[in-house]
Amino acid sequence: MDRICNEALLRKVTTPRAAAAHIKNGMTVGFSGFTVIGYPKVLPAELARRAEEGEELGITVITGGNVGDQLDGVLARSGVMKRRYGFQGNRDLRALANADRIQYVDTHVSHGPYLIKNGYLGKIDVAVIEVAAIRADGSLVLPFSVGIDDTLVKYADKLILEVNEAIPLEVEGMHDILTLERAPHTQAIEIFKPDDRVGSPYLPCDPDKVAAVILTNCEDTNQDLPAPTPDMEAIASHIVKFLQSEVAAGRLPNPLP
């Protein structure tokens, strides 16, 4: 509880089951996470449980990038995920999409905020955001990824926050979050040297939009990569030989940077 410094949000702490009840059949739900980091890990299991117990529950899922199996895999295998926007790398989700059991749109990771802000993905009913902590003013300390969290928090009708105690509090201060306006009102990003900061280390959040807060203690899962095949090793060898020949011919610097 010491990670939640806002009194109003402290009163909204509840169980995963109660928090998941805010998500209904047919909703569009945005989830935090990027590069298999900073995604909700507890609430998806509650949604899967409801479906496995016979409830009719199907949702559209939006993420800013690749997330872990506790989200994509769990929702895909349980049948909760009916449509998915954003990059993904889950084997089960991919198989179900290729079998036409999940409608999948492979939107580029840079296009998510634009599509959401301009209404191309429809209304976002709920956004589920993993955070390291909540400050006294309600602003959020994000984990090791930001992705499209700022867009989801701003445009979703309702928010559910997963406060993950497994995230080290030292993450506070590492981010520089700048939310741009909708086109054609997008402003310039005034970064001219490496130490320029143009945004905030924290993500502003309206406490009135938060429907529920749940406490978790879950590590991010690393994606298992397959062992290299002979073809993969041959490709890598060809690339190395090509670069070495380019250096020898004087077309690339020696040593390579």
Language model feature labels by segment:
Residues M1-P257:
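Conserved alpha/beta enzyme-core scaffold
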